[in-house]
Structure formats: C-alpha cells, structure tokens
Amino acid sequence: MSEKIYPVAKPVESHALINKAEYQEWYAESVADPEQFWGKHGKRIDWFKPYTSVKDTSFTGDVSIKWFEDGETNVSYNCIDRHLATNGDQVAIIWEGDDPSLDRKITYRELYEHVCRMANVLKKHGVKKGDRVTIYMPMVPEAAYAMLACARIGAIHSVVFGGFSPEALGGRIVDCQSTFVITCDEGLRGGKPVPLKANVDKAIDIAARGHVMVKNVLVIRRTGSPLSWAPGRDLWHHEEAATVSADCPPEPMKAEDPLFILYTSGSTGKPKGVLHTTGGYLVYASMTHEYVFDYQHGDIYWCTADVGWVTGHSYIVYGPLANCATTLMFEGIPTFPDAGRFWDVIDKHKVNIFYTAPTAIRSLMGAGDDFVKRSSRSSLRLLGSVGEPINPEAWEWYYHTVGDGRCPVVDTWWQTETGGIMITPLPGATDLKPGSATRPFFGIRPELVDAEGKLIEGAADGNLCIADSWPGQARSVYGDHERFIQTYFSTYEGKYFTGDGCRRDADGYYWITGRVDDVLNVSGHRLGTAEVESALVSHHLVSEAAVVGYPHNIKGQGIYCYVTLMAGSEGSEELRQQLVKHVRAEIGPIASPDKIQFAPGLPKTRSGKIMRRILRKIAEDDFGSLGDTSTLADPAVVDDLIANRQNRAEAA
C-alpha cells in the first residue's frame, strides 16, 4: 500500500467546482438526509412532470429500488433538446477514426437531427415503447445516435460490445427477446475489419433456434465492403433516414421506466442482463460526470471506453451529453498506428480530461516513455482511471509521465450494477494516494463486513458492501429478479454486496483489493491477488502481471504469477529469482511466488479485462475445457501460455 500522499494543488483547488470543506458538508448531508439531498440534486435534469416522491427503496425481502418515482422525463430530451436554445452550435461529439486522418465533429443541433431521424426509422418499422433493441456497433457516432434514438421513443436498448462472438450476441438477443438489431457492415480496429453484419446474420440464426425471431436489421455503412443481404429484413440506414422527418417528439417516460439492459458476466457463466431505469440513472450519471471530472463548460472530455460497456454508456454518452459536454469517441486502439496514439489524439483535439483503464496505462508504460514525450499534452488538466484497481507504479507513471505531475488522477471504483462512479477522489477536494480510490461519492455509504457479515469499523480489511441505495443503482436482472436478490442482497442481509474485497486505512481511504474470488488463501493467510500483482509490476522490468492460486499440497494454495516484461527484456531463471525476492521484500515471505511464467501477453477480453478464469485453469494444469473463449482479443496468447506452463512436474 503506497504511503505517498499528493495534496490537492492550490491551482487545482482554486479552479475546482468543489473544495474539501464543501465535499465534507455535502457528503454529511447526503448520508444524513438522502431524501433532501437527492430531492435537490434531482432537479439537475429537466422533468416534464416534477417528482414529489424522492426515495422509496428496500434492500430486504423482495428488494425494491425506486427514485423520483412519480416524475416524468426523457433521457434523449435531456441530452440534446434542452441544450439547443443556447448551445445548439457547440460540438457534442468529436469522432476520431481508427485511421488517424479521419475525424468528424457533430454539433448538438446536428445530433438532434441524426437522433430524430433514427428514432423515426425505428418507429416506421414498428418499434414501440418498451420494445428491446439490440445495438451491435463499433465506436462510430451512429452508436450514440442509436442509444439516444431508443431513449427518445422509450425503447429499451441492449448494447452488445462489437467484439463479442455471434454466439454471445445470439444469447443476449434471446435473453431480452429483442426483435430489432442495429449494426454496421463492418467495424475497424487497428486497421483490421471486424465482420459485424456477418456476425449478426449468424446470431439471428442462433436466436431463431431459441425461438426469438429478429424482424429487422438496420445497417450503417462504415467500410462499404460487400455483405450478404436479406431483403425485407435488412435495411440500409442511409436509405431509411432519407425517407423520414428530422423531428421526433420525445416520449414522456416515467422515472422508473427501463432505459437499458447491459449484460455483465456472472459467476455462473450465464450473463446477467443488468437493468437500469430512466430518472435516477441520468441524475447520477450526470452528477458524477460533472463533479468527479470537475467538468466545466468548454472542456474537451475523452473517455476511451467502448459504448459496449457501462463506462461507455455513463461516461461517453449519457453523463457528458446531459451536461452539454463535448465528448470524444475513439474508434481505434491505443497502439495503432503506434503506441503514441492516445497522446497524439490528446494534442490533436486539445483534450482537457482523459479517462482510461489501468490495463491500457500499463501496456503503454511498457512501450516506453518516448511515445509520450513526443507529444505536448499541455491541454490536459485531469486524468482518470477505471475498470480495475490501478497499481501504484502505473499510477505514478500516469501522474508524472503522462500528466507531467500537474494533473490530478481520479481513480474511480464502480460497477455495471452501480450505474455510475461510487468511490473516487474529487479533484479540488481529495488528497491523492496512488492506488487508492479514496472516498465515497455523495450519498454512498460503504461498509466493510467480515465473512460472518459482522460490520468492521476503523482501519480494516473486509468485504465491500453499500449500506443504502443511490439513484444510479440497477433495479433488477432483466427477467430474473430472484437472481438479482440472490447475487447482490442475500450474502449480507439488507446490504448491497459488491463482490469486491476492500481495505480501509486509518485516514478512511478505500483501497479495492480485487474480486473476493481473486483472494488467495496461502497457509491460512488471506492475500489479494491485486497486491501481489502490484508488487511484481513495481519491478522496473515488469510491464504487466496476473496472479492466480493453484492447489498446493502444503500451503493449500500456491501463488502462480504470469509476467509480461518491458519491451526489450528477456525472461531468465536469474530474473525469476530476482522477482521472488522483490515480492518478498514488497509484501513479506507469505507472498513468495511459487511459479513465475514469463508470457508475451495475457489473455484479455477486447475491453481489456484479464480473463483470470483461463489463467486459473492453466495454473491448475486443467486446460482441456477452458469454457467460453469467444471474447478473447488474441486467442494465440492462450496457446503460448499452455505450451510454456510451469506446473508440469506436479501434474506428471
């Protein structure tokens, strides 16, 4: 755990929306009287019919979560229409293509027309309020238009990441019984085409076997490559949009009407369709976007996520647009045409706020500083991290090398199920500790409990729960409320269980230690894999590390480490011994790695998450059935890991 503290710098504090005293005052009010606090802040969005009821929530029994229940609004109206009178000519979306020579700027007025036309196309083909629409798109502006068009007419969107296989897509179409799909002919990532329409065709066949018939596929032309076509079912968007009006009135929606379903992996392997609703979600997404990123009018804001993930929903589309921000959408990958792409884009578009994932930060750190140094990055004033705990070494590199030691880093902890950021620094209010998500956002009451469910006070390690509801919270698992209750509310009665382990330090700062199933039990001692990974990555030759447990006949669990080295470094027995010594020195003898496997890469999903399940199987010498590997970005990585596994002696 890093003991370093970076106090809020005076220039940051003087410019920021919230200072320390205000944070403390607002936070105290938000937990003492959530009704009053959210009653006030719920008004940050426009309501067609104002709410009189603010909070009606119960984490026990049948678990019911309702916010602003009698209010009526529309998300698309709040993200577009209400800005037109004063900011219609402001850029809403900057699109940066996969090819560095391609970009587009879309103003709020243009956004209005694009979204209304797409909404009218949906209506023309029979899509009604409450219908589910599946969106399977690359990072092009039309992905945002599709989401906003659904929200405009009250259809429920289910965005499926464009990297998912036809099987995964088909399963998600069946689960929410979607009969309308929006896609592209192809996507482009790192110069390589992604066969989206072909995948949709296969997924529709799979869905038909599950008795769900897709009626229409709306296709956006991206590359112009030839593709198979089903007349009557398949529709070209550019042809359809030309036949409809550029005005579409927003459907008044009740605050608790569903807005979207987003599938997230569950421990059972069957994805859960996390359900978010209209009013509370938008209040929370927009409020966290404004205060966590200290968003001020005129800032250029870039979140590098994909709209297929919750980060893309809340912090590329809904939060920023509700706040009349300029949001950047990036089609490409961080390493194409080379590992300086992020920094080039920051200079090109004068980005002020940059939000990315630790896995990207670590891989760019491994590529060396020259790619960063060739850019100026002088426009940057704030850096953010999302997706997993960031190890202190990557944090320090991000802060000093990317941000030149002048941009606060907001290390944000949250989940698909939370709708928005939960534990985070606020730039003008929170002293920073590298590796810590720091303090709760307004209205969030974190609690640590032990395995028996007893509340732990003060500095401690425990399971992270949230004691009370907040407006952005998911309401259910689509079509399976019982699973929602069992997954999140049955482990610790009356609390939302996050599934994450956490340490609270003496200053009341929170340190996420990783999923509770990523905790090792070594000779009776609890050890978070994130801690061991952090220790390994703090060695100057290590770019990335993943740690899993495997059965050990003396310790119960042994520690198996997969290590990717910095460019130009070679693995050797000598380096292996060095790393063991290094980890012992960082954490203690209990954390001594038993196996270290040098690997050219780690198995990751296309969103950058490490697939630890695969690493566990290989560590256990049980790679015959690796389960669903359809979401792997690079399957060849797995073959290399199996070929060079370190556990054959035990297995033999």
Swiss-Prot record:
The residues that the entry says bind CoA are 189-192, 311, 523, 584
Gene3D superfamilies for this protein: 3.30.300.30, N-terminal domain of ligase-like (3.40.50.12780)
Any GO CC annotation of this UniProt entry: cytosol
Q: Which residues carry this modification: N6-acetyllysine?
A: 609
Q: What is its EC number?
A: 6.2.1.1
Sequence positions that bind Mg(2+): 537, 539, 542
How would you describe the post-translational modification of this protein?
Acetylated. Deacetylation by the SIR2-homolog deacetylase activates the enzyme.
Record-level GO BP terms = acetyl-CoA biosynthetic process from acetate
Q: Where does ATP bind?
A: 387-389, 411-416, 500, 515, 526
Which reaction is catalysed here? acetate + ATP + CoA = acetyl-CoA + AMP + diphosphate
Q: Which GO terms describe its molecular function?
A: acetate-CoA ligase activity; AMP binding; ATP binding; metal ion binding
Query: What cofactor does this protein call for?
Result: Mg(2+)
Sorted UniProt keywords: Acetylation, ATP-binding, Ligase, Magnesium, Metal-binding, Nucleotide-binding, Plasmid
UniProt function note: Catalyzes the conversion of acetate into acetyl-CoA (AcCoA), an essential intermediate at the junction of anabolic and catabolic pathways. AcsA undergoes a two-step reaction. In the first half reaction, AcsA combines acetate with ATP to form acetyl-adenylate (AcAMP) intermediate. In the second half reaction, it can then transfer the acetyl group from AcAMP to the sulfhydryl group of CoA, forming the product AcCoA.
PANTHER family reported in the protein's UniProt record: ACETYL-COENZYME A SYNTHETASE (PTHR24095), ACETYL-COENZYME A SYNTHETASE 1 (PTHR24095:SF14)
Q: What HAMAP family does the entry give?
A: Ac_CoA_synth
Q: What is this protein called?
A: Acetyl-coenzyme A synthetase
Which gene is annotated as encoding this protein in its UniProt record? acsA
